[in-house]
């Protein structure tokens, strides 16, 4: 798994919380990547109708944060309809009893786990993540205040 999904969530929070539109250079600085990668992720989010571009001035959300599910974001940036977390090695030996049976056994177990992940992503919204972010910021600011005293 690569980092497009977490990058997309980071971007969407920034765009949602910014008082003025943020461009790809500003987002890239916060994410810790380059602007071309941000534009690549943004293009996928744009095709999915999640964000729009305001010319060179920056990006804007096209939906309210409580209407954007993590599953929708995942599907947009990974360009797939199914959550894919696990891979199975490709060439197990048919001469071995385990090798002959490992792919169907693990395939079923892995698909079940991916369905659970998919359900969790479908139930989580950008607004949920933003609320947790605010809690984390508040907790960290209180910890910093305690250290100063």
Residue spans for each PLM region:
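Short alpha-helical segments that sit at the start of domains
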Residues: 1-11
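Short helix-capping/hinge SLiMs at alpha-helix to coil transitions
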Residues: 15-19, 63-64
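Short acidic, hydrophobic short linear motifs in intrinsically disordered regions
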Residues: 20-28
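Basic amphipathic alpha-helical segments that dock to polyanions
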Residues: 42-48
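Beta-hairpin "wing" of winged helix-turn-helix
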Residues: 48-56, 60-62
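Conserved segment of winged-helix/HTH DNA-binding domains
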Residues: 65-91
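C-terminal regulatory/oligomerization modules of transcriptional regulators
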Residues: 90-149
């Amino acid at each position: 798994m690569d980092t497009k999904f977490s990058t997309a969530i980071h971007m969407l929070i920034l765009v949602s919380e910014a008082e003025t539109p943020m461009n790809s250079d500003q987002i890239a600085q916060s994410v810790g990547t380059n602007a071309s990668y941000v534009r690549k992720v943004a293009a996928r989010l744009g095709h999915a109708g999640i964000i729009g571009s305001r010319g060179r001035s920056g990006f804007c959300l096209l939906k309210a944060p409580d209407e954007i599910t993590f599953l929708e974001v995942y599907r947009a940036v990974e360009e797939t309809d199914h959550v894919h977390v696990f891979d199975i090695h490709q060439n197990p030996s048919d001469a071995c009893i385990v090798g002959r049976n490992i792919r169907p056994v693990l395939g079923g177990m892995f698909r079940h786990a991916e369905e659970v992940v998919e359900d969790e992503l479908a139930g989580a919204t950008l607004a949920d993540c933003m609320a947790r972010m605010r809690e984390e910021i508040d907790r960290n600011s209180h910890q910093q205040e305690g250290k100063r005293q």
